[in-house]
């Protein structure tokens, strides 16, 4: 059957209608010719009884021995170290200070007894009977002047009151070195050491510092200065000598 459509419809509209009609026709065709399969009836199930076979006993499980843990080894005893003995450094004993020399006692003046002066004998007048050749009598010497008294001179020069001995250098004592130092110095009116000089030292640069340090503390009697005083200081392992 054909439709007489007016010619005024455009081609796109016709094409769209044709496509929709084809789709609807295809769906109708498929629904009519579809075969619906019916499920087949259930078949009986045959069951055959079978006698069970002799069951074998299950294999014996191995006996698991308990694991014995080894005893822990005893820890080694820590032996405490013996305390170290303290090293005692024996310092050299200070040498005794020299005792001040005792002051000399002033000597007592001993007065000598005065001699008696006898008057000289007057000469006799010459006798006319005496021989003129006779020698004139000698007169005794005049002893009018008294005998000279002994004079006591006061000691002169510096007099030490305190002389500190120099300390023995530790290095020289360790090496058992002995030596000698000769010095020259002045003594001031207040009894102190001035112008200290080292004249010689054997061995050199070993004992000089100790000598200077000790002599700065020396004291002399005040009011008795001196210049150019020389002295020798001997360092011996058994002691220090000051000459």
Curated annotation (Swiss-Prot):
Region (Disordered): 53-163
Single GO term (MF): energy transducer activity
GO biological process: protein transport; siderophore transport; transmembrane transport
Annotated signal peptide: none
Location of region: 7 X 2 AA approximate tandem repeats of E-P: 69-82
Regions of compositional bias (Basic and acidic residues) in chain numbering: 82-96, 104-121
Record flagged with keyword Cell membrane: yes
Residues passing through the membrane, by range: 13-30
Family under the similarity heading: Belongs to the TonB family.
Protein name per UniProt: Protein TonB
Gene: tonB
């Amino acid at each position: 059957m054909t439709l007489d459509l007016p010619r005024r419809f455009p081609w796109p509209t016709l094409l769209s209608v044709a496509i929709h009609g084809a789709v609807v026709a295809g769906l109708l065709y498929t629904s009519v010719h579809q075969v619906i399969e019916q499920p087949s009836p259930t078949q009986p199930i045959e069951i055959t009884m079978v006698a069970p076979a002799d069951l074998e006993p299950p294999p014996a499980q191995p006996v698991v021995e308990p694991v014995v843990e080894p005893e822990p080894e005893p820890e080694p005893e820590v032996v405490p170290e013996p305390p170290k003995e303290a090293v005692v450094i024996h310092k050299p004993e200070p040498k005794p200070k020299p005792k001040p020399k005792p002051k000399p006692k002033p000597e007592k003046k001993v007065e000598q007894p005065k001699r008696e002066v006898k008057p000289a004998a007057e000469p006799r007048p010459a006798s006319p009977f005496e021989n003129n050749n006779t020698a004139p009598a000698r007169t005794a010497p005049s002893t009018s002047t008294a005998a000279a008294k002994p004079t006591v001179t006061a000691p002169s020069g510096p007099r030490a009151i305190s002389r500190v001995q120099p300390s023995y250098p530790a290095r020289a004592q360790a090496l058992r070195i002995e030596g000698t130092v000769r010095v020259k110095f002045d003594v001031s009116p207040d009894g102190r050491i001035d112008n200290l000089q080292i004249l010689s030292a054997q061995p050199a640069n070993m004992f000089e510092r100790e000598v200077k340090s000790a002599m700065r503390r020396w004291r002399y009697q005040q009011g008795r200065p001196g210049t150019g005083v020389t002295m020798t200081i001997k360092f011996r392992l058994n002691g220090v000598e000051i000459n």
